[in-house]
């Protein structure tokens, strides 16, 4: 039966990497050992909760999610966590054997979650390829040059 399984999913954004472990549970979510509801940075917390809000309370109450995230900045980590949770939820409810009624129902939930995530924001499931441009020789930053003086 597909319900007892554990799914490990990853999400990346810039330099941040998040690994989510999703297992059957009661709807608890931890980010680096801190419950999501009391995560200190509010904007990051709201961003991380997006996949759970889109999925709905019915789906959230079926799973426990533990996420380890490292690297990058605050919002990069939030986007990585968001991607890991969204990918993990889609994978958790996916089922290949379609002969069982429960399996068909779970597979429908997985397809509905996938389309809902893609309609809301494509980067929940698909990575964002943009990266920071490296600094060039004899420049202040990637594009800015020294100020030219004519006098």
From Swiss-Prot:
Gene field: rps9
PANTHER family: RIBOSOMAL PROTEIN S16, RIBOSOMAL PROTEIN S9
Species, as recorded: Aeropyrum pernix (strain ATCC 700893 / DSM 11879 / JCM 9820 / NBRC 100138 / K1)
Keyword Ribonucleoprotein listed: yes
Entries under InterPro entries matching the protein: Ribosomal_Su5_D2-typ_SF, Ribosomal_uS9, Ribosomal_uS9_archaeal, Ribosomal_uS9_CS, Ribsml_uS5_D2-typ_fold_subgr
GO terms classed as biological process: maturation of SSU-rRNA from tricistronic rRNA transcript (SSU-rRNA, 5.8S rRNA, LSU-rRNA); translation
Gene Ontology cellular component list: cytosolic small ribosomal subunit
Keyword set, alphabetical order: Ribonucleoprotein, Ribosomal protein
Listed GO MF terms: RNA binding; structural constituent of ribosome
Protein name: Small ribosomal subunit protein uS9
Family: Belongs to the universal ribosomal protein uS9 family.
UniProt KW Amino-acid biosynthesis keyword: no
Pfam families tied to this protein: Ribosomal_S9 (PF00380)
């Amino acid at each position: 039966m597909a319900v007892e399984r554990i799914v490990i999913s990853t999400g990346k954004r810039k330099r941040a990497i998040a690994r989510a472990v999703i297992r059957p549970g009661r709807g608890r979510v931890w980010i680096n050992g801190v419950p999501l509801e009391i995560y200190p940075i509010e904007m990051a917390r709201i961003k991380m909760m997006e996949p759970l809000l889109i999925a709905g309370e019915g789906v959230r109450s079926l799973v426990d999610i533990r996420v380890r995230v490292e690297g990058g900045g605050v919002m990069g980590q939030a986007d990585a966590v968001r991607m890991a949770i969204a990918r993990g939820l889609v994978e958790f409810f996916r089922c290949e054997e379609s002969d069982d009624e429960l399996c068909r129902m779970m597979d429908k939930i997985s397809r509905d979650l996938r389309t809902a995530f893609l309609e809301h924001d494509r980067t929940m499931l698909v990575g964002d390829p943009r990266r920071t441009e490296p600094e060039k020789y004899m420049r202040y930053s990637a594009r800015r040059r020294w100020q030219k003086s004519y006098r």
